[in-house]
Amino acid sequence: MEDRTRLLGAVGLTVAMFLLVQLGALALVEPFQRAGYQQVENPSDPTNSLLYVGAVLVLTAAMLAIIKLDVQWLLRGGIILTSGLLSWYVFSVVMPAGLAVTVDGAAVNVLAIGAALAVSVALLVHPEWYVIDATGVIIGAGAAGLFGISFGLLPAILLLGVLAIYDAISVYGTEHMLTLASGVMDLKIPVVFVVPMTLSYSYLDAGDDSDGDDDGPADTESSVDDAEDAVANPDGADADHPEAERPDITDRDAIFIGLGDAVMPTVMVASAAFFAEAEPLVSGIALNLPALTSLLGTMAGLLVLLWMVLKGRAHAGLPLLNGGAIGGYLIGALASGLTLTQALGL
């Protein structure tokens, strides 16, 4: 009974964090658009997706090189600075500008800058699991909102499709994401959601003891893993190996879920809310039927993914999550009266 409660608690916390990222991104869509934060001139251009995928490949190669050269402090510093920047984007549109000051003719929101600095400092001095997770929700919603208003429907679908394929190859094929995962786990940076399985769990105390032998993926782009799992056991057993020889998920203190697993499908949700020509369902948040069904499709994919992971094996996350987001979006778009051509952004 206790093990069941722990598992249900972990699943509930994971679903809650994904939902916060998605609802946060939807809430940020219109403020980001009004603030002029759209990142490209032509959001409908499919080449935007190719450029982003290329950037992902370059960034992955750079991170692997940093790990190989044993200069992980560069990666940690870069992620902390990026987290502060993304936090500023979010805080700049949600915090009142009452304390704004003028610098070179432009208004600067002092509260937003202070809050963003607080996020970076917290990551630097006390990267406990709740700091990592809270930061992940903030920057995940911000990143998804920014990309959502910058990628039209077709570019978003192409982006999610290509990244899902890349994720599967990098986890099950080349396995270079496994190297990246094991290299970033000790850095205590918000590239993963840390889901504790016990109330007493401390990410700081876990340190090298639980992560040093980790061979499972928990990376910036995708993949889901548990704290001490390996893709195969020391004898080379694969997914068909008898259940008794697999690690027991209930023996672990935490599971780790890549932040990208929450961000990438949410790009589709935000893009649907911004670009799909459907009637809004509620006021105060960018939510229409295609965005809602995309959100529900993501959640369905997440539950299937967690069911697979809780069996004790690591899995690529984006095939299920992105597939659910795209499939859910298309169902909602067609149900709202759009033609398939319109739904695909053609």
Language model region names:
Residues M1-L346:
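A membrane-topology feature that recognizes alpha-helical transmembrane segments
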